[in-house]
Amino acid sequence: LFIQDKYGSYFFNTPNDLYNGKIYRYRYGVANVDVPGDPNWAPRFGAGQVGFYAQDKWDVTDNFQLTYGLRMDIPLLFDKPVANKPFNDYARTKGWDVRTDQGLSSAPMWSPRVGFRWDINNDRRFILRGGVGLFTGRIPFVWLSNNFTGTGIQLSTYDTRSTSKLNLIYDPNGQKANAEKLKASGNQTLNVFDKKFRFSQTLRLNLGFDFNVLGINWTAEGIFSKTLNDIYYKNLAYEPTGQTLGQVDPSLSFDNRPMFKRVTTGQPYSYVYALYNTNKGYTINLSLKAEKHFDFGLDLSASYTWTKSMTINNGSSSVAQSNWNYNYTYRNSNDPELGNSAFNIPHILKAAAFY
């Protein structure tokens, strides 16, 4: 946990502006000392995850087995963020149905799964296997840590393009001099999450075939993963105007990116990052592997994997602002379309030799 822009963030239009100290934009995050009582304040909260798993194996015949199990995970958040009553009241009037002191649901996350293994000729030469189930990984509570820092109570964020009176201060601990020149008392960047928010869960199906042909052991496998719950962010402080950049600027008539307007004008809420769930997204993996073992001690193997992974938000940052700002979309940042995952590696080819 940290105070974003604590040491000041300066933006410049050109390298020459940087050289001349001509600031285009300035951002500064600071703890409101009269609230937490510490200029280096950081929130404290407790979280945990309880998991239970039961599994059984049934030998239906000599060459056909079923394995089935049930996992239950319970996410626990032992604290709540601080209530920002003015914002909570304002959010209610906007119909956002969010508040800064929202608690996390501790409803159990059930993950049943079943798998099979069929030794077709009962000689281990041709084996068909597969399964289907729901899966929940380790819960990334860092996504919720933003809500404890971004209540709008303990921190203020200065974000201005009115920089004529500001100086380029190289001392990271001397940024207060610029903050004191700003007329505003500091806008608030808030982080909230939907009261129905649940952590990520995936439906996964796999089918594999192990066989031996010409003395070579082969494995062909396919895995399909469908998103049931994943994350996506909205900036509630901005909404589309209904126009594109090309409509606003005729010289850019080819540009169909939507224009946005701030809907919190007159309020100190510059950015309101809200965390929601989505069921959009999937991953397909197809692989083929060959292995050859020689009696004189040489082992050879080669494999190829093709992957297609689609998502609407990679969740690659610990900061809500970054997860929203740097999520690629050509349409609407608050309603992103399905696109290639940042973690997608379409083609993987491996080869190995051991002696």
Question: Where are the regions a protein language model picked out?
Answer:
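Short acidic-glycine motifs
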Residues: 1-355
